[in-house]
Amino acid sequence: MSKTLYLVQSPFSATEQALSKVQNLYQSGDDVVLMGDAALYIQHTFIQQLACVFVLEQDAENIAAILSSNLETISYARFAELCLNHSRCISLK
């Protein structure tokens, strides 16, 4: 079981700061979901260093032109599974 699931749900203007917080807290085995405007930060240096970053299918439509090898688009059902498979979930807004 992974340890922490980070849900980055911040408005675009606050996403840089939210990702900085995640970067400071992130440990091996943790996962990150970019939601809403935060998905536009898919090319952020920290995000690119992750083996995998999750984006909801609806949010992925906004970044369709941006290719990222570590991006995994997920349905709401898969999102629910992710939440249940982690011992804690932290939302950054």
Predicted regions: what is each one?
Residues T4-L19, D31:
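Short, glycine-rich nucleotide/cofactor-binding loops
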Residues A38-Q49:
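N-terminal beta-loop-helix "entrance" segment that forms/cooperates
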Residues A65-K93:
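C-terminal structural segments of small proteins and small subunits
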Residues G29, L50-A51, H86-S87:
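Short, well-ordered alpha-helix to beta-strand connector turns
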Residues E16-Q17, N62-S68:
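Short, charged, surface-exposed secondary-structure boundary motifs
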Residues K21-Y26, Q48-L50:
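Short, solvent-exposed amphipathic alpha-helical segments in soluble enzyme
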Residues Q43-H44, D59-I63:
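Long, charge-dense
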Residues V32-D37, C52-D59:
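Short internal beta-strands
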